[in-house]
Amino acid sequence: MFEKDKWMSIGEIVAPQGLRGDLRIKPSSDFPERFTKPGKRWIQKTDELPTEIKLTKGKLIPGKSIYVLSIEGVSTRSSAEEIIGWKLVIPIDSRPMLSKDEYHYHDLIGLEARSGPSKALIGYVTDLIKGGNDLLEIELVEGKKVLVPFVKEIVPEIEIKEKWLLINPPPGLLEL
């Protein structure tokens, strides 16, 4: 049986590259070696078991946040097109250890967002948007989505094991 919480997406196959079966990958990982170091990986179609593959080479396209990967057995453009939309996944227990105040994307999604001295529930983390300053997408309990800067001053406390984080928003941030 497939256990969804034992796997973590590190990227998505978004397009073929050229005629020889190379693949464009949009990463959702901050660890470039996952896309450049040859070896065993897994790809997964939505709601199916991951399939083991062998990454033969990979490189970052200069000036873009896209990797081009070569996978053993995918040697034509049409075979590459068949797996567009599939995820590149890894076993969740193979994640690298992080320093204090560093978090895996997968661990943040679904956390309760709390606010104020009473730490009242205000919503849930639904996404992390990477950029110059990362943003947490929070779906508020009333259904509206807001973007919150993911900085210590606004998100001073994160309790991964207890599945919540504290937000101290500046006035008006949650009303936007």
UniProtKB/Swiss-Prot annotation:
It is found in: Cytoplasm. Keywords: Chaperone, Cytoplasm, Ribosome biogenesis, rRNA processing. Residues 100-173 form the PRC barrel domain. Pfam families: PRC_RimM, RimM. GO terms for biological process: ribosomal small subunit biogenesis; rRNA processing. InterPro entries: PRC_barrel-like_sf, PRC_RimM, RimM, RimM_N, RimM_N_sf, Transl_B-barrel_sf. PANTHER family: RIBOSOME MATURATION FACTOR RIMM. An accessory protein needed during the final step in the assembly of 30S ribosomal subunit, possibly for assembly of the head region. Essential for efficient processing of 16S rRNA. May be needed both before and after RbfA during the maturation of 16S rRNA. It has affinity for free ribosomal 30S subunits but not for 70S ribosomes. NCBIfam families: 16S_RimM. This is Ribosome maturation factor RimM. It comes from Prochlorococcus marinus (strain NATL1A). The gene is rimM.
